[in-house]
Swiss-Prot record:
It comes from Albinaria caerulea. GO terms for cellular component: mitochondrial membrane; NADH dehydrogenase complex. Belongs to the complex I subunit 3 family. Core subunit of the mitochondrial membrane respiratory chain NADH dehydrogenase (Complex I) that is believed to belong to the minimal assembly required for catalysis. Complex I functions in the transfer of electrons from NADH to the respiratory chain. The immediate electron acceptor for the enzyme is believed to be ubiquinone. The chain crosses the membrane at residues 2-22, 56-76, 85-105. This is NADH-ubiquinone oxidoreductase chain 3. PANTHER family: NADH-UBIQUINONE OXIDOREDUCTASE CHAIN 3.
Amino acid sequence: MILYVLPTSLSLCLLLMIIYLLTANLFKFASYELKTPFECGFDPLSNMRSPMTTRFFILTVLFLIFDVEVVLLFPVLSMVSFMTSPLIIMSIILFMMVLLIGLLYEMYYGVLDWVLN
């Protein structure tokens, strides 16, 4: 079996490398600006101590909070069919309500609005 897999995978790798080398010159970018790195809207060659807007910081913190909460919910929600205790179900509902209230609070005070009206 390995005698068939090894030559097949090597020939596939070689074929893909040849295709890449033949087509790499077809997609050259004319603009120098397209080749420069783009990182959070800042010029990488500018002063690194320039102040960052608080909107980036708030958005990052909110993303981390909701990301951690979603990661915590995945194992719990996968076990819902095995749970029969009302205490566990009520704790899940309470956790979801806290998430929903936090999201509504942020929407009400305009934290999630990127462009101010």
